[in-house]
Design a protein with these regions (language model features):
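Short, flexible loop/turn elements at secondary-structure junctions
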Residues: 77-79, 98-100, 113, 122-124, ...
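Compact, glycine/acidic-enriched structural inserts
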Residues: 113-167
Length: 210
């Protein structure tokens, strides 16, 4: 279970356009409908290229995983319950969903000026999946610890991240030897890159060497 949870051997296509960062830098300064409408043709070109990138990566992931679908998130923000009424996101966000019912978790790529990262794991697990994760950790937490603390994994993906319950999840004692892991409501691993990394021609080679 632990191996399936965190393993991701991914190879990306060579590069993305640096115009992505230029566009979002300008949008962050002019986050209004008038400016966006004037620059929508430019956005559509970038959106199309990112979709092609996502579909290409989906094919590559399917060489060693089981990916059901790729999703590029909409640029329009839901401002109904937000104090921030700016209408547009200032980043591209995309996700690759693993094939159910046999596979869980997924992958996410975030493209924003000076905030580029790849993530894998469980961002919003449903109650059944979260229950299963906790049961597996309770049964053999050391297996999971060995995996996420292995030097070759940790040097790339860093520390386990995610929201936690304050004390102990229902059904588990506060003095459970694996309580530090059981408290997690999310299981996320992340690797960050610079703007230059994501558009560099050798980006795929750097990932291969990770």
């Amino acid at each position: 279970m632990a191996q399936r949870l965190v393993t991701w051997n991914v190879r990306l296509m060579k590069a993305l356009s640096p115009n992505i960062f230029k566009f979002f830098s300008e949008l962050s300064k002019h986050n209004n409908r008038e400016w966006f409408d004037q620059h929508k043709p430019e956005f559509k070109v970038l959106e199309t290229s990112v979709k092609q990138f996502g579909e290409t990566l989906k094919d590559k992931l399917n060489q060693h995983d089981s990916i059901d679908r790729f999703k590029l998130f909409r640029i329009y923000r839901d401002v109904r319950f937000s104090k921030d009424k700016t209408p547009y996101k200032t980043h591209f966000g995309m996700a690759w969903h693993r094939t159910k019912p046999y596979y869980r978790g997924g992958y996410y790529l975030h493209l924003k000026p000076n905030d580029v990262f790849l993530a894998c794991g469980f961002w919003d697990p449903n109650p059944i999946d979260l229950k299963r994760i906790r049961e597996e950790i309770d049964l053999d937490g050391q297996e999971y610890r060995n995996l996420i603390n292995a030097a070759d994994f940790k040097n790339v993906w860093g520390e386990l991240q995610g929201d936690k319950v304050k004390t102990a999840p229902k059904g588990y004692a506060k003095d459970n030897p694996n309580i530090d892991l059981l408290r997690y409501k999310q299981h996320i691993f992340m690797v960050r890159y610079t703007n230059q990394d994501i558009v560099a021609e050798d980006f795929i080679d750097r990932l291969d060497g990770a």
